[in-house]
């Protein structure tokens, strides 16, 4: 018998907003709100010349234009990453399913690579420093991650590993065929990838990190890698993959290179030093 401390999973409706035939699901709403907040927050950072040590290297008009391309990078990269990293055999047999985004299946690591492509392409086309555009993009990203993980929780998906039912906040997820008490790992990840990461980056920005191109980008990559690996210890692996080698999950495997890349970017940003204001506007 399960103890009385076990928390009942809230009975959320799958549709967040419904007006006649028009419906928006929670995950789509998380994407929309995350992108809108990110755009507004990016504009506020760019308006504050003190944070950059002079005029920001990106104009408000440019960041307005960039939103479209980074959104495409997130969606196309996220879906492509899920197809390649998590369920390739299924999609080889059912290629039409690749385009059924409403059925779910997105990968952060794929979305991140899609954003990298969008940043590099847009920066090159508009004469913007790539590292500075990467800094502003990753500075706003944690809010989208927070909302995405909350949407995962509301949808009752990507739940955590089974745990002792005596854990005070253990939950039984309605869609779990085993009906075992589990860690609400979506909320753990929301706290680490969203709240913690946003707070650390915000503090770094206030301390002048945007004056060192690549610093925020490197910190985001490094800290996300650390928090994702930590969260994977509580998250149930995708059923079609299970555990890989030595207890590694796909999420861990894809996050390990982020630790190296993030650390390299931070070291290079420190060695490079803060540019003079005249250099920052090139």
From Swiss-Prot:
Q: Which InterPro entries match?
A: Lgt
**Source organism, top-level taxon:** Bacteria
Q: Does the keyword Membrane apply?
A: yes
Q: State the pathway, as annotated in the record.
A: Protein modification; lipoprotein biosynthesis (diacylglyceryl transfer)
- GO molecular function, one example? phosphatidylglycerol-prolipoprotein diacylglyceryl transferase activity
User: What GO terms describe the biological role, i.e. biological process, of this protein?
Assistant: lipoprotein biosynthetic process
* TM segment ranges: 19-39, 58-78, 104-124, 190-210, 214-234, 250-270
Which HAMAP family does this entry report, sorted A to Z? Lgt
Name the UniProt record assigns to this protein: Phosphatidylglycerol--prolipoprotein diacylglyceryl transferase
Q: Which organism is it from?
A: Bradyrhizobium diazoefficiens (strain JCM 10833 / BCRC 13528 / IAM 13628 / NBRC 14792 / USDA 110)
Lineage summary: Bacteria, Pseudomonadati, Pseudomonadota, Alphaproteobacteria, Hyphomicrobiales
